[in-house]
Amino acid sequence: MPPSLLSLEGATVRFGGRAVLDDVGLGVAEHEVVCVLGPSGSGKSTLLRAVAGLQPLDAGRVTLDGRDQSGVPAHKREVGLMFQDHQLFPQRDVAGNIAFGPRMRGASRAEQQARVAELLQLVGLPGAARRSVAALSGGEQQRVALARALAPRPRLLMLDEPLGQLDRSLRERLVVELRELFGRLGTTVLAVTHDQGEAFALADRVVVMRDGRIAQSGTPLEVWQRPADAFVARFLGFENVAEASVAGQAADTPWGKVPVPEDAPQGTRTVLVRPAGVRVVPADEGLRCTVTARTFRGTHVAVHLQPEGAPRLEAACALRAAPEVGAAVGVEFDAADVVVLGGSGVPE
């Protein structure tokens, strides 16, 4: 693995005796895009503020390019920070906002103008230099905030819920544009978000946090295919999670015997059954369930099932094959879509 541009070693922040950042170790390589994901209160925003120099550490350290950042004030750290609410200067036009960082670093007027023009072109707003920020749409404000964060050429760009205030269609479009832009510029990025789709679309690596600690770190594919534990699986939106006892190629679960892959770890575990692995069959076959709800997902219908005396299940059904609410159905399970997790929360 390439050396880290950013490194956190034992980073700890306490509020009133409670560790909101608890002995965190994390490295971000140069040109890597890392998204920190987690529910409210997991410590992800505190982590970002600690790296930016806005929140002092109670223990541990942050290094940037090998240099300890202890005692380095926020405005002297080589980082750019973009918040969810943009925080543009309302009294300045677009150019004035973008040029602020270079001007603070002593750039000449000509250099400022050239940088503004370059960045407006990059973020898709050519010719907007003299526009008032109050006249910009939400998406345009987001682009200007990004240009302002990039203007001083930071070693590290940090994004705090960068698309949180935008509508879904605009978020989905901008996350693709951001990914392309960061790849083109070779930008090193540390972003925090609570939106799983945003993180998985944007990141080279996803870090899931829980209660101030890192619950799992890996590529989007690794985290999606192999959640570390029940918390990560449920946070990613998987509902079919249960404790189980695995012996051979079967798991004894609240839903009865569930087939597992050949190489599945044995003993007391947690199993995840992906919705695609919950197969709806006639009511006289498999586990008997009642359809309690249906949710249209675009490419399929999520069918919510209530077995008798067992936790609810979610199945992914083809658009024209989904049973109606109230229908009695049977359920069988496909081993290929069953994931056996470590009982202790440690990935196998």
Swiss-Prot record:
**UniProt main location, coarse:** membrane
Q: Name one GO biological process term.
A: transmembrane transport
Q: How does it sit in the membrane?
A: Peripheral membrane protein
Under SMART domains, the record lists:
AAA
Question: What reaction does this catalyse?
Answer: Fe(3+)(out) + ATP + H2O = Fe(3+)(in) + ADP + phosphate + H(+)
Q: Please list the residues that bind ATP.
A: 38-45
A Pfam cross-reference name: ABC_tran
One GO CC term, this protein: plasma membrane
User: What enzyme category does the UniProt record give?
Assistant: translocase
List the keywords (alphabetical).
ATP-binding, Cell membrane, Ion transport, Iron, Iron transport, Membrane, Nucleotide-binding, Translocase, Transport
- State whether keyword Iron applies: yes
Query: Subunit structure of this entry?
Result: The complex is composed of two ATP-binding proteins (FbpC), two transmembrane proteins (FbpB) and a solute-binding protein (FbpA).
The protein's name: Fe(3+) ions import ATP-binding protein FbpC
This chain's source organism reads: Streptomyces coelicolor (strain ATCC BAA-471 / A3(2) / M145)
Q: State the gene name recorded for this protein.
A: fbpC
